[in-house]
C-alpha cells in the first residue's frame, strides 16, 4: 500500500507523431521498469496495427517507481491515452482517472487540432498541466515560437516548459522531476466504502476479461465480492495486479492507485468504461459522475469477397467484439453482395482500424459499403425512427422530416491554404463559426454535417493543404435538413449496396459522378445496359453502356438490301430479348471502386 503523497497519476496529451509513445518508452527505460533486453519501441502499444500506424487505440497503463532527488521513492502511474477523436470517450475516462497531464508539443510543428481537443478535455477534468517541448534537437525546432503559441492558443503559461528530445533521451530526468514536483498527489479516503472507476477493459484468452481500475476511495483486496453499479452484476475477484507493463500480482489496491483485476468475466460488454465498482455489501451510495454508454456514430456493411468466408468473418467479428464494447454488429443480406454484417463504429478511424484488424489478424478479404451515419426520421404519425442503413428508408409519403447529426470541426491550417479549406467546408454544407490566427497558422471552426465528413473529407482536406492541415471534431447534435435517398439502378434493377442518403442540392452532382464511374467499371455485355441514379421514381442521372455487336452482315455479298435488313432485325430482336432476360454481372472490383468515389 503506497502513501497518497508518494503517488502521482498522469497521462500524456499530444497530437499524432509528436512523440507521446516515445516519451513513455524513455520514462520506462530510465527508471528501469522494463529490463533493457525486453525494451522495444512503443512498448505500451501492444496491437500490431497501433505500432504500424503509430497511433494508440486502447488506453494502456504502466506503474513506474522513481527515486526522486528529495530522497523519497515515488510511484508514478502513467495512462497512455488514445489521441484520436474517435476514442474521445476513452480519453475522457482516462483523464478522470489521473490528476495531471504532460502536454507534449513538437517544437518544430507547434500546436495542432488534436492537441487542442485533448488539452480541453484535460482542463475539463481539472488537471494540472506541464508543457513539454519535444524534438528540440531538430534543425527546424523553434522552442520560443511554440512557447508563445501554447500561451496564445491554449492560454497556458509555457515559460517553464520542459525541453526534451524523447528520441535521444535528452531532458528526460527533468520530466520525471517535473511530474513529482509540479503535479498534485491524488486524494482519497481509505476508510470510506470502496469506489473505483473502470478505466478500460480487454479480453485475454487465458484470464477472460481484464479490467483496469482506478481506486478513488476505500480498499479493494483479492477475494472481495464486487458489484458493477451500471449493470448490477456481482463478481468475485480472482486476481489483483499492477502493470509494469507486464502483470505483477499484488494483495490490495488503495486510494489513488491504478491496477487491474480479473473476476471470471466472460465478455467485455459486461464491463462498461466509466462504470463504478464497489463492494457487494456496504458499497458506496452513488456512482461516480459522467458515465455514458458508447454510441456508434458511423455504420457500414462488411461483406466477404468470397461468400465461403462468411463463417470465418462471423467468428472474427465475434472475437473482435469481445475486446471492443463500442463496436456493434448485426447480420445483413444484400442482393448484390450476399451475406455480411452491418457494423457500427465510433468514427472513421475506428472503422479503418476494425477493418484492418479483420483483414490482417483473420486473413479475410472484405468489401466495405459506403459509410453512413444515423439519421432520425420523424414520421407523420408522431413516431421517431433511427435509420442506420439507407435501404431501410421508409416511404417518403409517411415521413414528416429527417434530421442528421452535425459536428463542430476545428481545423488548424497554414494561412496560404486557408482559401482552399474554406471552399472545401462551404462545398460540404458547412457553416463557419470562428476564424482566428496564431502566428502563420489559422484556426477555423465549422459546423458541418457528419454525413459530408464520413465520405472522404479528411482525404480531400489533406490533399488541398498538401498534408499540413490537422482536423478534429465533436458531435454537437441533430438538425433538420432536406435529405433524400438516392438509389442506383443497373439495367432497371436497384443495387442495394450502392444506395445512399444525400442532400437534395448535391444529389444531381453525386448521382452523375456515380453513374459515370459505374459506366467505366462495368464491362460491356451483349446488350445495352442503362445505369441510372434515381430519387424515388425520378431519374436524375443516366449513362448507357453500349452493347457489344457481332457484324451479322459480313457474309452477305452483292447488293440485296432486304437480306441485310432481315439479318439486322433478327439481331435486334435477339438483343431485346436478351436485355429482358439477361443478368448484368457487376464485378466485385466495380463495387469497391465505386464506393471509393471522390465527389
Swiss-Prot record:
GO molecular function terms here? GTP binding; GTPase activity; guanosine tetraphosphate binding; ribosome binding; translation elongation factor activity
Name the positions where GTP binds.
Answer: 17-22, 134-137
Q: Does the entry feature the keyword Hydrolase, yes or no?
A: yes
Query: Per the database entry, which stretches of residues form a coiled coil?
Result: none
Q: What class of enzyme is it?
A: hydrolase
As recorded in UniProt, its EC number(s) are: 3.6.5.n1
Q: Which InterPro entries match?
A: EF-4, EFG_III/V, EFG_V-like, EFTu-like_2, G_TR_CS, LepA_C_sf, LepA_CTD, LepA_IV
Taxonomy, superkingdom: Bacteria
PANTHER family in the cross-refs: TRANSLATION FACTOR GUF1 HOMOLOG, CHLOROPLASTIC (PTHR43512:SF4), TRANSLATION FACTOR GUF1-RELATED (PTHR43512)
The Gene Ontology biological process annotation of the record reads: positive regulation of translation
Among the Pfam families in the record, one is LepA_C
Q: Quote the function comment for this protein.
A: Required for accurate and efficient protein synthesis under certain stress conditions. May act as a fidelity factor of the translation reaction, by catalyzing a one-codon backward translocation of tRNAs on improperly translocated ribosomes. Back-translocation proceeds from a post-translocation (POST) complex to a pre-translocation (PRE) complex, thus giving elongation factor G a second chance to translocate the tRNAs correctly. Binds to ribosomes in a GTP-dependent manner.
Q: Mind listing the UniProt keywords for this protein, alphabetically?
A: Cell inner membrane, Cell membrane, GTP-binding, Hydrolase, Membrane, Nucleotide-binding, Protein biosynthesis
What does the sequence similarity comment in the record state about its family? Belongs to the TRAFAC class translation factor GTPase superfamily. Classic translation factor GTPase family. LepA subfamily.
CDD domains, A to Z: EF4_II, EF4_III, LepA, lepA_C
Name under which the protein is recorded: Elongation factor 4
- Catalysed conversion reaction: GTP + H2O = GDP + phosphate + H(+)
- Domain annotation tr-type G: ranges: 5-187
Q: Could you tell me the membrane topology recorded for this protein?
A: Peripheral membrane protein
The protein's location, in the record's own words, is: Cell inner membrane
Origin organism is: Cereibacter sphaeroides (strain ATCC 17025 / ATH 2.4.3) (Rhodobacter sphaeroides)
GO CC terms in record: plasma membrane
Amino acid at each position: 500500500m503506497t502513501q497518497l503523497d508518494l503517488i502521482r497519476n498522469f497521462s500524456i496529451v499530444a497530437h499524432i507523431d509528436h512523440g507521446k509513445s516515445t516519451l513513455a518508452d524513455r520514462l520506462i527505460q530510465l527508471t528501469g521498469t522494463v529490463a533493457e533486453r525486453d525494451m522495444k519501441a512503443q512498448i505500451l502499444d501492444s496491437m500490431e496495427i497501433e505500432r504500424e500506424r503509430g497511433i494508440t487505440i486502447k488506453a494502456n497503463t504502466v506503474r513506474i517507481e522513481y527515486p526522486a532527488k528529495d530522497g523519497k521513492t515515488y510511484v508514478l502511474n502513467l495512462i497512455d491515452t488514445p489521441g484520436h477523436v474517435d476514442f474521445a470517450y476513452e480519453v475522457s475516462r482516462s483523464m478522470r482517472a489521473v490528476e495531471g497531464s504532460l502536454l507534449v508539443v513538437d517544437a518544430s510543428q507547434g500546436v495542432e487540432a488534436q492537441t487542442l481537443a485533448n488539452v480541453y478535455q484535460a482542463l475539463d477534468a481539472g488537471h494540472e498541466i506541464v508543457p513539454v517541448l519535444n524534438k528540440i534537437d531538430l534543425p527546424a525546432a523553434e522552442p520560443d515560437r511554440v512557447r508563445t503559441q501554447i500561451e496564445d492558443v491554449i492560454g497556458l503559461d509555457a515559460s517553464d516548459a520542459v525541453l526534451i528530445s524523447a528520441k535521444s533521451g535528452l531532458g528526460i530526468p527533468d520530466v520525471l522531476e517535473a511530474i513529482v514536483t509540479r503535479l498534485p498527489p491524488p486524494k482519497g479516503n481509505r476508510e470510506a466504502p470502496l469506489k473505483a472507476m473502470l478505466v478500460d477493459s480487454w479480453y485475454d484468452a487465458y484470464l477472460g476479461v481484464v479490467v483496469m481500475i482506478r481506486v478513488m476511495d476505500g480498499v479493494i483486496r483479492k477475494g472481495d465480492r464486487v458489484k458493477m453499479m451500471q449493470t448490477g452484476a456481482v463478481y468475485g475477484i480472482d486476481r489483483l495486479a499492477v502493470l509494469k507493463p507486464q502483470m505483477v500480482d499484488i494483495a490490495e489496491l488503495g486510494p489513488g492507485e491504478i491496477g487491474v483485476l480479473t473476476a471470471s468475466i466472460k465478455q467485455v460488454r459486461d464491463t462498461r468504461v466509466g462504470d463504478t465498482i464497489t463492494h457487494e455489501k456496504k458499497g458506496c451510495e452513488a456512482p461516480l459522475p459522467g458515465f455514458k454508454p458508447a454510441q456508434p456514430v458511423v455504420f457500414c456493411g462488411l461483406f466477404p469477397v468470397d461468400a465461403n468466408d462468411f463463417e470465418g468473418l462471423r467468428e472474427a467479428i465475434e472475437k473482435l467484439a469481445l475486446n471492443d464494447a463500442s463496436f456493434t454488429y448485426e447480420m445483413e443480406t444484400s442482393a448484390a453482395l450476399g451475406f455480411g454484417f452491418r457494423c457500427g463504429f465510433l468514427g472513421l478511424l475506428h472503422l479503418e482500424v476494425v477493418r484492418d484488424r479483420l483483414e490482417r489478424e483473420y486473413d479475410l478479404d472484405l468489401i466495405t459499403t459506403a459509410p453512413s451515419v444515423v439519421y432520425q426520421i420523424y414520421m407523420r404519425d408522431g413516431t421517431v425512427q433511427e435509420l442506420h442503413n439507407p435501404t431501410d428508408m421508409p416511404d417518403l409519403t409517411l415521413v414528416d422530416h429527417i434530421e442528421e447529426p452535425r459536428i463542430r470541426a476545428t481545423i488548424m491550417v497554414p494561412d496560404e491554404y486557408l482559401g482552399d479549406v474554406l471552399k472545401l467546408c462551404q462545398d460540404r454544407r458547412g457553416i463557419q463559426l470562428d476564424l482566428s490566427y496564431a502566428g502563420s497558422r489559422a484556426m477555423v471552426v465549422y459546423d458541418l454535417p457528419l454525413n459530408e465528413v464520413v465520405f472522404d473529407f479528411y482525404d480531400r482536406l489533406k490533399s488541398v493543404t498538401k498534408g499540413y492541415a490537422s482536423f478534429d471534431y465533436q458531435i454537437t447534435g441533430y438538425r433538420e435538413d432536406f435529405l433524400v435517398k438516392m438509389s442506383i439502378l443497373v439495367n432497371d434493377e436497384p443495387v442495394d449496396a450502392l444506395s445512399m442518403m444525400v442532400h437534395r442540392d448535391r444529389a444531381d452532382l453525386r448521382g452523375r459522378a456515380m453513374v459515370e464511374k459505374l459506366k467505366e467499371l462495368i464491362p460491356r455485355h451483349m446488350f445495352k445496359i442503362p445505369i441510372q441514379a434515381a430519387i424515388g421514381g425520378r431519374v436524375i442521372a443516366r449513362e448507357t453502356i453500349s452493347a457489344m455487336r457481332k457484324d451479322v452482315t459480313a457474309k452477305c455479298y452483292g447488293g440485296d438490301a432486304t437480306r441485310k435488313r432481315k439479318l439486322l432485325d433478327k439481331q435486334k430482336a435477339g438483343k431485346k430479348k436478351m436485355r429482358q432476360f439477361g443478368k448484368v454481372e457487376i464485378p466485385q472490383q466495380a463495387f469497391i471502386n465505386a464506393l471509393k468515389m471522390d465527389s
